[in-house]
Amino acid sequence: MNFFIDEPHLQEKGLRNYWGYNPLAMFALEPSYAADQKHPLNEFKSMVKTLHQAGIEVILDVVFNHTAESEKTFPTFCQRGIDDKTYYWQNEHGDYINWTGCGNMLNLANDVTRKWVLDCLRYWVTECHVDGFRFDLATVLGRETPDFNPNAQLFAEWNRMTFYNKLN
C-alpha cells in the first residue's frame, strides 16, 4: 500500500511490480491503487471508515526490511539520500548487506532507523485508523546482528508505544 517503484531489472524488461514490495515512501500511499490517484489518502481514509462501519478490521501489509534503493550505481531514492550508513546495514566497503535477497536491509539496530519505522506505524494508526500490520519478512525486524533476537530493541520500543495499546 506504500508508494513504490518498479525495480530496475523489471523496468529493463518492460515489466511492472504489482505487489508493491519495493517501497519508496512509507508515509505515502501508492496512487495507482486508488480510483482518485490525485487524492489517495482521502480515499484510503474513507475506505477504512467504511470497512470499520461494516465491522471489518484493516490490517496493512508493510515492508520495513528494505527500501527501493538499489546498488549505489543507481539513482538515490529515499533513505540513502538522508544518511546511507544510518539507515542501511553495510559491510566494511560500504556495500549493502543483503541477508534477505532484497538488495538492502534497513538497520533496525540504529536508533534513528527504529524511530522512523515506529513513526511510520504510528502515522497509519493515528491518522488513518488502521487496526494492525502484517510485516513482510518479519523476522528481519528482530535482527540487530545477522541473527534474530526475540528481545530486539524494536520490539521493546513497539511494546512501549501508546498507540500499540489501541491495536490490542
Task: Label the model's feature ranges.
Residues 1-129, 137-166:
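Substrate-binding/active-site clefts of carbohydrate-active enzymes
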